[in-house]
Amino acid sequence: LELSQFRGGMSNPTFMVTDGAEKRYVLRKKPPGELLPSAHAVDREFKIITALYGSGVPVSKPYALCEDESIVGQMFYIMEFQDGRVFRGVDLPELSAPERAEIYDNMADVLAALHEVDYTDVGLADFGRSGGYCERQVRRWSQQYEASKTEDLPVMDKLMAWLPENMPDDSLTCLAHGDYRLENMIFAHGSADILAVVDWELGTLGNPYSDLAYNCLPYYAPDPRRGNLIENNPVTSGIPSEENYVARYCKARGLSEIPHWNFYLVL
């Protein structure tokens, strides 16, 4: 066997394994050292990939989960290797405008497909709490901010007051990726087809619109490593505006709009 480590996906170290017949696999494991009990849960990743394999959501074929830490030092799992492309920059400078448009359309469609999965039918009813996701997020991060702040920031106090007062219906529940972004997809060579969505370590039962809002952050927030879409011109770039990207997602799910969209962006 030959082993080489991938760039990226480093929260849980990821390796390519090549056997004597030149067949390639992916090994993903917990990092070494002392860890929080709920952190780096590769068994949860394996469970969600196993549940989704064969559905309308593209994931790599799961092969085996090994919980015996004596084998490689930590729990790990093996899945199929996807020979494809990973794009780091959200503006896709290496592609043409029509290719960019198709990439973003497919990304929106796959997220919509994920949120349409009946998590009970695929055996993930116990994968998280049903309902109350936004309330838990507001409470948790407000507590984190209060515990770690070093100075008073009136704008944060205003935000923490605004969120609970403007919280929408919090009963919506779906299977959420938690880190759905361009970099966490493997695309086919020569086409915009998504071979697999990867890095499921934050997957849980959550709110679909919060998952979508996270995916739309490049339209608002600069990122020194991945770039942004703050000044995106859809006419020349081929990349849809945020409004049209969200509309594509809505169309795929049969929705007319996302109510309280600003709330999810702020959250």
Name what the model sees in each region.
Residues 186-226:
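Catalytic activation segment of kinase domains across protein kinase-like and atypical kinase folds
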Residues 2-175, 188-193:
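ATP-binding pocket architecture of kinase catalytic cores
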Residues 48, 182-184, 214, 244:
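Hydrophobic side chains within alpha-helical segments
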Residues 98-100, 200-207, 235-236:
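Glycine-rich "substrate-gating" loop/helix at the edge of Rossmann-like oxidoreductase active sites
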Residues 210-254:
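Active-site activation/catalytic loop segments of kinase-like enzymes and analogous catalytic loops
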Residues 83, 92, 146, 202, ...:
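A generic structural signal for secondary-structure junctions
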Residues 128-129, 256-267:
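All-alpha amphipathic helical-bundle segments outside canonical DNA-binding/catalytic cores
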Residues 175-177, 182:
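Catalytic-loop of the protein kinase fold
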